[in-house]
Amino acid sequence: MHKKRVEEGEASDFSLAWDSSVTAAGGLEGEPECDQKTSRALEDRNSVTSQEERNEDDEDMEDESIYTCDHCQQDFESLADLTDHRAHRCPGDGDDDPQLSWVASSPSSKDVASPTQMIGDGCDLGLGEEEGGTGLPYPCQFCDKSFIRLSYLKRHEQIHSDKLPFKCTYCSRLFKHKRSRDRHIKLHTGDKKYHCHECEAAFSRSDHLKIHLKTHSSSKPFKCTVCKRGFSSTSSLQSHMQAHKKNKEHLAKSEKEAKKDDFMCDYCEDTFSQTEELEKHVLTRHPQLSEKADLQCIHCPEVFVDENTLLAHIHQAHANQKHKCPMCPEQFSSVEGVYCHLDSHRQPDSSNHSVSPDPVLGSVASMSSATPDSSASVERGSTPDSTLKPLRGQKKMRDDGQGWTKVVYSCPYCSKRDFNSLAVLEIHLKTIHADKPQQSHTCQICLDSMPTLYNLNEHVRKLHKNHAYPVMQFGNISAFHCNYCPEMFADINSLQEHIRVSHCGPNANPSDGNNAFFCNQCSMGFLTESSLTEHIQQAHCSVGSAKLESPVVQPTQSFMEVYSCPYCTNSPIFGSILKLTKHIKENHKNIPLAHSKKSKAEQSPVSSDVEVSSPKRQRLSASANSISNGEYPCNQCDLKFSNFESFQTHLKLHLELLLRKQACPQCKEDFDSQESLLQHLTVHYMTTSTHYVCESCDKQFSSVDDLQKHLLDMHTFVLYHCTLCQEVFDSKVSIQVHLAVKHSNEKKMYRCTACNWDFRKEADLQVHVKHSHLGNPAKAHKCIFCGETFSTEVELQCHITTHSKKYNCKFCSKAFHAIILLEKHLREKHCVFDAATENGTANGVPPMATKKAEPADLQGMLLKNPEAPNSHEASEDDVDASEPMYGCDICGAAYTMEVLLQNHRLRDHNIRPGEDDGSRKKAEFIKGSHKCNVCSRTFFSENGLREHLQTHRGPAKHYMCPICGERFPSLLTLTEHKVTHSKSLDTGTCRICKMPLQSEEEFIEHCQMHPDLRNSLTGFRCVVCMQTVTSTLELKIHGTFHMQKLAGSSAASSPNGQGLQKLYKCALCLKEFRSKQDLVKLDVNGLPYGLCAGCMARSANGQVGGLAPPEPADRPCAGLRCPECSVKFESAEDLESHMQVDHRDLTPETSGPRKGTQTSPVPRKKTYQCIKCQMTFENEREIQIHVANHMIEEGINHECKLCNQMFDSPAKLLCHLIEHSFEGMGGTFKCPVCFTVFVQANKLQQHIFAVHGQEDKIYDCSQCPQKFFFQTELQNHTMSQHAQ
């Protein structure tokens, strides 16, 4: 068996092949109308199927397929765009595209399952472009490749099987979504529920049907007779018809070129130039495919050419196996005995009973074994030899029917067709196709099932040997012929489909004049008389005779009657009335059988109520006795006719009655077509219900909620993801074990219960206890605010005064820790700017001088100047002095009701009403460790501290000063602040013309005399400080400010300015004294305090000089600090020189009242302070030498004790400690003194060095006199300096 190489793809349809031959011979004009309908129906169906395969979508419903033009390779997102492009703008072809049998037949770029499939289909795309590259417009979402076309990208994505979890069970194509896979499977299952009402086309999607309906639009009245496509003009139709002609010429050319191709092996696809080489190759490499290799091993699928090779193979490969007959239970001692016994299964025995296949079995054996379905019958997938052979030169069969020709069997699973006996076929099935499911073989006469073909042969030979049921010999007739046209088909399924499509439509009538030519010998129908004459010459004339036989010659062959079910949509064909009856009883219960016989009166052809079966029959038959008597019986009504013409006329009446009306068996309603009847009949039997099916276990649920609950309970896995190492675990226990093993770094912290300090090492805690608690056992007095201990009650009372707010506002009774906070409060809340004489912080005076200046009586200042513009303003936070206030003795918070105070004490200090002071102190000790830098309140959590800090920030400040960068909540406060940057002298003199100004009116009028041309807003500027003003209000504020300064300076120089005198308070009894001489100066932890004589007498107990705690031996320099500013000095001479220069007014000889003529204090010399030890130096060289000594002794590495990070300078360490202080604060850094906000820690550090001095530091070290701005500085200092 030799086969030439052919193109891969689907085999051409028989009807299309016959149509092509007729068209080539007679042209399109001679094509009959019914055959045109047949060809169009098949072409439409094929085009629809291919289109649905191409247009399958693998994305969301909104993301439809990408459609590519065949000519210009341009991609489109929808079929409508592609249709418009090909109809109007495509340069390659417009209306004459032969592939556009309907609009949506353009291939989709998503239709490619693999590159090899595309190449096999004849794709001529460049391999270099398909491989992809980089920088191309369509990148892959799973890898780094990109492609020049979207179709290449979709083809490439199929290799990412791990990203496409859903797979088609038919073609192994991969999909990203399940819904895309389900839509694709419809292409394989043929689920097409959208039907065209104009033609027989069906679609699985509604959008495809809508596009197809455009071809039937009335706007395109000119229809193509081949593909039924509509056109708007005759010229377009003629151009389209030329495309059909070119397509047929191309097919003819391709067939001619295919004959010149090399010969290809069917098994390994090797090609050979000569048939002899192909035969030699098949014999040596694939003996199972060769016709000469007919010796098969009884144990395995191997096939051999000669007996010696077969016997050698059995002795080598199957020497230990028993030699058993595959057809029966007998066993033999040698291989030769097995093969001799196998001959008895196919040779006649001594009793002359033929053991060869029975004629009945020969007609149906291969058909019944053709399908792997155990319940399949002859009408489903029979496999006689499908190769169409011409029916020429066939000899007539003998009338006695005894000369049966040899039956050839074919395998239903492979291309092997030539099996001389059932035994050989059975061996082939059991060895080569052992993996196939076991199937039963049905007897065509009694419908009994047999396990093997051999058993079926024996059954037919014994039970149905004399059965008179006529059968057709497939060994002699190689094809099935249609009764209504010259079409031939290889199997019954193709014949049944052809009859249903071509001859059972609403317009198809096989009884018209063109189909009235039937052969008298075999009852085959033909279109023309010439075709009938040619058929008789070829099929029913002897080889040597050229004359036509008489049309009345009786047929000598037996034919098989074919019955079709009238209730099924696909009209299956059955070989016997028994099988049809069984089919109706199983599938159409309670429906009367259409083939039930009636009385002869009811069977009259004249009656219009005759019920007949479907006209789809493969052969017209008659019994042998009737034919021999010259009668033609009708198998529909049992009438007999003497000649063939009468019989043919009678049969046409049956067909006309059947096609005229079809009645519903339930309600007797008539319908024009079987499809309409089926749709109507379905309504009688149909009940609809909605169920939701689980894809995994196929369980059904009545609601979506039940399905989701089932999926969550049965098919959902909860995974636990470790955010530290990104590992995933399937149970809670697993991740707990993982966290305990890998991420549980146990680290002990040692806390001092007395002062709540934490230490990383036990040795550090021991050092802390040694220096802080063990060395001072007599310090029993502890501060309830900071936990510091003192030896006596006097020292504790002196220390408590440091927690009070020293600077009080005279307007609203508010108190502040630092003078700068009081000044800021006065400017923002009370709009008081004259701070030179009243608050001791005049512009231009160094910060150290503010401490020496006496606080002013602001109320007296307002009495002197009642016209001050801001004296009437009151703050929202002002407290009415007339209401009774209840203050908290722990944090100083004041409330108007006692209940509010009790709630505050319970919420913030955990002190319940009625508890004594001991419980309060105990609760204070266990108070939280998060301390507010503004009001010193503590909190248990960082979140509580963060919420508390929001109360200090006040309203949003959107107006920033262009000079210092400070922000203000309103434009008015910003304007008042900008005035404070004035650097003019106290003389209200114009800096342009030197004219003195005495009042605000003079100032405003004089400013108009010197306009500022650069100021586009107002055109003016302040003539005293030369600042640009943005509004008239700002100019008035400048005038008020400068005139107040002038009045204040004159008041300070007048004798009346000496009336204000500072009062000094005792630190213990808080009594006020007019002179410092009335108080005794004490030094407690490096800070100066004053006690009156009475307190000293009551508390000293004879130890006046022992009030100050003794200095430890390891602090020799603790006493060399300035008692006023706490600056450390290395020698007593330096301290004395510092006191003479910087604190001359406080020395005994100058401690009296200051002279009235002195208007400004002595300016302080510029000093340099070490960041590490806070020592002060007079020049830069000395501090450089000091820093060098630090580097020599301690090295250049400075460690942060909080996180063990190293830095190469103390400044960087200080900046790092500032970052520690503001961790979790949103990336903002706020000055603890003036509350200016910065976004960088180094900016805050620069701000502290430039603006604030030693007196503004908040946190004091309990073991040395050093002070710090931040608590983290104090912690790092304690752990590094006092832990040893």
Swiss-Prot record:
Effect of mutating E534A: Abolishes the ability to bind promoter of BMP target genes
GO molecular function: DNA-binding transcription factor activity, RNA polymerase II-specific; RNA polymerase II cis-regulatory region sequence-specific DNA binding; sequence-specific DNA binding; zinc ion binding
Protein's GO biological process: cell differentiation; negative regulation of cold-induced thermogenesis; negative regulation of DNA-templated transcription; nervous system development; Notch signaling pathway; positive regulation of BMP signaling pathway; positive regulation of DNA-templated transcription; protein localization to cilium
Residue spans of biased composition, Polar residues class: 102-117
Location in or out of the cell: Nucleus
Biased composition (Basic and acidic residues): 34-46, 1136-1147
Name of the protein in question: Zinc finger protein 423
Native organism: Homo sapiens (Human)
Annotated function: Transcription factor that can both act as an activator or a repressor depending on the context. Plays a central role in BMP signaling and olfactory neurogenesis. Associates with SMADs in response to BMP2 leading to activate transcription of BMP target genes. Acts as a transcriptional repressor via its interaction with EBF1, a transcription factor involved in terminal olfactory receptor neurons differentiation; this interaction preventing EBF1 to bind DNA and activate olfactory-specific genes.
Location of region: Disordered: 1-64, 87-117, 346-398, 590-624, 1136-1163
Comp. bias intervals (Low complexity): 363-377, 604-615
Gene3D superfamilies recorded: Classic Zinc Finger
Start-end of Acidic residues biased regions: 54-64
Annotated effect of mutating P913L: In NPHP14; found at homozygosity in two siblings with nephronophthisis, cerebellar vermis hypoplasia and situs inversus
PANTHER family in alphabetical order: C2H2-TYPE DOMAIN-CONTAINING PROTEIN, KRAB AND ZINC FINGER DOMAIN-CONTAINING
